[in-house]
């Protein structure tokens, strides 16, 4: 199986690194294209894959093509490569807001397409990726794509109408989490903790809390209640968060993200 990556930025690099680390595809069977020769050489040195500046070469030589350029570049790049794609290939799109119908229309001929939405924790092998196979993709082919996506984290298949919501919860929410960690650390610093230790405690607390929820399968509300002793300091702090609409504000942020993604 030969894989192609058109655009080899951070996200493509994370996907490639995960695939190689898991031994799913060898580096010499992975092709990547960059906009400049300098970037192509850097990608080759970093990942050991074959690189070029020719997008059409990658499209023509690959069984599965990952389109990893910026959303605003999609139309131009698709116009460039569409005549080099054939109906047996799978095109994997990682751009938010680009629907299967939009992609199919721009390609202009029958094409197997999988729409995916990874997030930045993929860079450390802990990504969350929602994916939606098009009608021409067989269950066996969808399984192959899922296995590739699972090389750098969790992969969840969804119906396409849910992809923008998944993009908000998975793709944009790391920014919310980083803000929360920063705010926790700021509170610790305000109470005398050194910055480095405050950030470490906050980050590990978020990591441990998430792991506990995933491993126990408990509802987050139940786990929250277990920490809140009657009349204790934790329930007092939860009350303060609720006074400032912590959950409501987060929910509105997710919905704002979805609205923006749909407008791209």
Stretches with model-predicted labels:
Residues 37, 46-47, 55-60, 64-131, ...:
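Rossmann-like NAD(P)(H) cofactor-binding subdomain of soluble oxidoreductases
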Residues 102-112, 128-165, 178-215, 264:
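Internal alpha-helical scaffold of NAD(P)-dependent oxidoreductase catalytic cores
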Residues 203-264:
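NAD(P)-dependent Rossmann-like dehydrogenase/reductase catalytic/cofactor-binding core
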Residues 1-53, 60, 126-127, 189-190:
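NAD(P)+-binding Rossmann beta1-loop-alpha1 motif at the extreme N-terminus of oxidoreductases
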Residues 30, 40, 58, 194-201, ...:
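Small-residue helix-packing motif on alpha-helices
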Residues 114, 163-168, 220-225:
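Short pre-catalytic strand/loop immediately N-terminal to key active-site residues, enriched for Gly-Thr
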